[in-house]
Amino acid sequence: MLRSTLSNWREYLTPISHTSTFETSGQLTPEEFVKAGDYLVHMFPTWKWNGNDFQNVHHKDFLPNDKQFLVTKKVPCKLRANNYLELDDTETKDVGDGWALQEEHSQDSERKSTNNADDSELPEELEELHIVDDGDDEEYDDQLYDNEFADDDIVDIRPSTLRFYDLYITYSTSYRVPKMYLCGYDNDGTPLSPDQMFEDIAADYRSKTATIEPLPFLKGNNISVSIHPCKHANVMKVLMEKVRSSRSRARKVDPQTTDEDWEDLQSDVDDGLRVDQYLVVFLKFITSVTPGIEHDYTMEGW
């Protein structure tokens, strides 16, 4: 609780910056956060802004009243985090404090998107990228959930394992990046205790990045688990550098490239990852912290 209190004071005291440093720092201004949120809501309609519910919201004056935070509700979570096995046959690149970038080489069964959003605008170089924890998880039975069963059948078979989460994203003034909050419920709608919610956080992150705290943007005592954003900007910088490096290498080996093409190619490198795509990529690496939560924005190839 002390950590949560100190974090709230830091959020309150940190001055707001409206100068964009996205390309160099991986951080966002409030205006860029809104732009990225609009893109997320447009591409994935299960995500929504808080809208006109002004009565129950603590407003920050540097954000529009109807765009204080993003929310998606009743996201299923059928297995606990320890049931997920770290993928084998991969290469990883450490980005500090336990975060690792993973490039997929094995034929694993990825969670598929349940919506029809087109992710073709995302840089091609990121399609094979995963971000995973570097802890040792227990192996789970691959036959536990047969594809022949529908979701309703699963609820009947294993009612005690099914949970739901409301996910919130707001803007962190102290780190100038998005910050994720999770509120969990049992399958009968009973709120989960903090210890129960921690069961759905990957073991390697529970003591590093997860904090129990009330939702700061809603009135009342809504207990949540927040994902500490201290490394988010650094991870985004690594992702952007990956895009630039990949496209730069492609330019060097392309025999069709001429001097006249340089300006267009340089523009492609500079614009490899747009600021409005920030939250889509942000949610990709959040899945390494909450592997059991079945985000419906998880796309094939990630």
Curated annotation (Swiss-Prot):
Q: What does this protein do?
A: E2 conjugating enzyme required for the cytoplasm to vacuole transport (Cvt) and autophagy. Required for selective autophagic degradation of the nucleus (nucleophagy) as well as for mitophagy which contributes to regulate mitochondrial quantity and quality by eliminating the mitochondria to a basal level to fulfill cellular energy requirements and preventing excess ROS production. Responsible for the E2-like covalent binding of phosphatidylethanolamine to the C-terminal Gly of ATG8.
> Which gene holds the coding sequence for this protein?
ATG3
Look up and give the organism this protein is from.
Kluyveromyces lactis (strain ATCC 8585 / CBS 2359 / DSM 70799 / NBRC 1267 / NRRL Y-1140 / WM37) (Yeast)
Region: Flexible region; residue ranges are 84-159
Supply the alphabetized keyword list.
Answer: Autophagy, Cytoplasm, Protein transport, Transport, Ubl conjugation pathway
Which GO terms fall under molecular function for this chain's record?
A: Atg8-family ligase activity
GO CC annotation: cytosol; phagophore assembly site
Query: Does the record carry Secreted as a key word?
Result: no
Residue ranges for the region (Disordered) are: 102-125
Q: Give the UniProt subcellular location, in the record's own words.
A: Cytoplasm
Q: What is known of its domains?
A: The N-terminal region is involved in phosphatidylethanolamine-binding and is required for ATG8-PE conjugation. The flexible region (FR) is required for ATG7-binding.
Keyword flag Endoplasmic reticulum: no
Q: What is this protein called?
A: Autophagy-related protein 3
Q: Which PANTHER family match?
A: UBIQUITIN-LIKE-CONJUGATING ENZYME ATG3
* Bias-annotated ranges (Basic and acidic residues): 102-113
GO biological process: any one? autophagosome assembly
Per the record, the similarity remark reads: Belongs to the ATG3 family.
Q: Where's the active site on this chain? A: 230
For the region Handle region, give the residue spans.
234-277
Its quaternary structure? Monomer. Interacts with ATG8 through an intermediate thioester bond through the C-terminal Gly of ATG8. Also interacts with the 40 amino acid C-terminal region of the E1-like ATG7 enzyme. Also interacts with the ATG12-ATG5 conjugate.
